[in-house]
Amino acid sequence: MTVFPRKPALLVALALFAGAAVATAEAQSTVIEGRKLAFDRSKGNCLTCHAMQGGDLPGTIGPELKDIKARYPDRNELVAIIFDETKRNPLTMMPPFGRNRILTEQEINAIVDFLQTL
């Protein structure tokens, strides 16, 4: 005797929904971590050179960080810029955060996730 009828389609749908909810929570967590890094003056340090929404006392050396997803539709381009902008522009003042090991690959990806929300 089965107490619960077997409904494979329902079980699959519930599993997919649960997986999507976990993925969304992880993405939000990464964005929060990226925001912390971007505003941390001793680590990501974006505010030293860039103005961005929610940042206090921003610098004005670099461009304002807004409409990032529209300006950089290719996420990998933004990752490469943060990792080592000198490859694209040898005269840049932007530190090569990845090449100099200021930020890890995971931290750069978190910052990019955050910047894409601006």
Give residue spans per PLM region.
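Extended, non-globular alpha-helical segments
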Residues: T2-K7, E77-P96
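Cys/His-enriched microdomains
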Residues: G44
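Positions in alpha-helical segments
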Residues: I32, P63, T92-P96
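Electrostatic cytochrome c docking/interface patches
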Residues: V22-R41
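N-terminal alpha-helical segment
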Residues: T30, L57-I61, P90
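C-terminal capping alpha-helices of c-type cytochrome domains
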Residues: N76, I81, K87, R99-L118
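Gly/Gly-Pro-rich "capping" loops immediately C-terminal to redox-active cysteine motifs
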Residues: F39, L47-F83, R99
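N-terminal export/targeting leaders of redox proteins
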Residues: M1-Q28
